[in-house]
């Protein structure tokens, strides 16, 4: 079990001990079966937690990467605006279409994952409270029109 660091991945791995007690000699022993199922669920939850930590770290790196590409694109846009009609003379005016396609695929995958989770959460809230939640998630706004 890991304890999260301030605003980031886990800093310290907390030790723990697993104690296995014999519950009987039969595989059909209900206590042994329940324990085995519990242990399997705990392991699955630990794997999910590890994957979530990895995803969070990737998102942090991804956010920095996206911010850098956004700044570069804005700079290129300003340069292109400054060139005016002479933009054909600039060799750096070419866009990177394959990169754009990959970015759009990543955005679509993230949107799909987040939208499915928000839908599940909202259904749970609606069922438990009886009212519909219609609030947009916080965060930066979409693309800016020029």
Curated annotation (Swiss-Prot):
Coiled coil: none annotated. Signal peptide: none annotated. Residues 137-146 have a biased composition (Pro residues). Pfam families: Suppressor_APC. Residues 121-146 are annotated as: Disordered. This is Suppressor APC domain-containing protein 1. It comes from Mus musculus (Mouse). The lineage of its organism: Eukaryota, Metazoa, Chordata, Craniata, Vertebrata.
